[in-house]
Amino acid sequence: MDKNLHILCPDVPWPADYGGVIDPFYLLVQLKAVGIQVYLHCFTQNRAPQKELEKYCKEVHYYRRDKTALLSNTLPYIVKSRSSKKLLQELGKNNYPILMQGIHTTYFLYKKLLPNRKILLRPFNVESTYYQQLSALEINPFKKYFFKRESRLLKSYEKEVSTMIPILALSQTDKQFFEEQNARSYFIPVIIPWQEVSILPGTGNYCLYHGNLSVNENQK
C-alpha cells in the first residue's frame, strides 16, 4: 500500500468552519492517524496559510488563484482559476496517487497533463446545479449572469470529467447523478469528528448559524 498521497484542495481547509473545508480537514486528521503522508496543495483567495495544517501533512503548498480566468469562455471560472503551473510542477516530482477535492481542482486532469497517475475525485456537490440555484436567487444582474454562465459551463464540464476517474460522492443523491453521467461513483459520507462532542460545560445562550449567510442560497 502506498503511504504517500497528494491532496488538492480548492481552499485552505482550516479553520474548519464551513461545508467546503470540514470534510477535507478531518480527512487529513484521519489519514495522519493511519500513517499516510499527505502532500497538501491549497488555493488561496480569502483565507491565509495556516500552521495548523502542518501537524497533519508532510508538506503544505499554497497557490494563488488566477483571476484572469474570468475571461475564459470555455472553462468554468472555479476550475480555470486553479490551473497553477507551480502545482503541476509539484505533482510531477513523484508518482504518488492524487485525491482531487471538488471539481474545482480537476484542470490538469481535464487537460490530460497527469498521464498514468492514480487519481480519485471527491466532488463537494453537483456544482452546475449549485450555481444554477445561486443564479435563481441573485438580485445583482452582473452576479446573476456570472452564476448562470458558470452553471452552463459546469454542466458540460462535469459530464466530461466525471467519466475520467472514480468518483467518491458525499451523498447518495450526488452518487446517483454521477452514475447517470456514466461515472464509476461510490458513496463515502462526510468525514466529521463524530468520536467526540466539542462543547463548553454548563448551560448558556447560543445562536446557531446553519450555513454561510453571505451566500444567497443559505439566506433563502
Can you name each region flagged by the protein language model?
Residues 114-137:
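Active-site proximal beta-strand in glycosyltransferases
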Residues 29, 85-92, 126-130, 139-167:
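Membrane-proximal helix-turn-helix segments that form the acceptor-binding/catalytic region
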Residues 1-61, 93-94:
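N-terminal subdomain of nucleotide-sugar transferases
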